Amino acid sequence: MSLGNHIRVFLCVVFMGVLVGYVYNAKKDITDHDYIDIVKEGYLENFSDVTVRNAFNYAFFEPYWRYYQAKTKEQVVELSGDITFQGEKGHAILQFVVDEQTKQFSLRAMKFNEVVLNAEQKQKLVGMVYHTWEMKQLAYE
């Protein structure tokens, strides 16, 4: 094997190592972040008796949490999962925005089956999630 081939093989190995490292670290950063913990352990306004994590884990099938920084530089925690809403089974996506200074968060956007929900629909979905949690708590008593 010539020196040129050795260099090409070496560069390919280095490139693959960098690529694997990037993919591994990017996945870890997205699903394991302090802002995700802030939202999971926090409470939504008007629902101070149960954490966001507990309420949504009861209502969502296989909830998936991830973090990213939006193009607007906002810190976004996104929760997605399957849920039945208004008699229809589907996939919901909720986006919480975390304030970097105060570490407070708010629910900003929500989709159900790729349709953006308006304020009234968001309230209904969140209310249904917390109602589901309450009903399951009563069932365990």
Regions found by a protein language model. Name each.
Residues L3-R8, L19-E141:
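Cystatin/cathelin-like cysteine-protease inhibitor module
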Residues R8-V14:
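Sec-dependent N-terminal signal peptides
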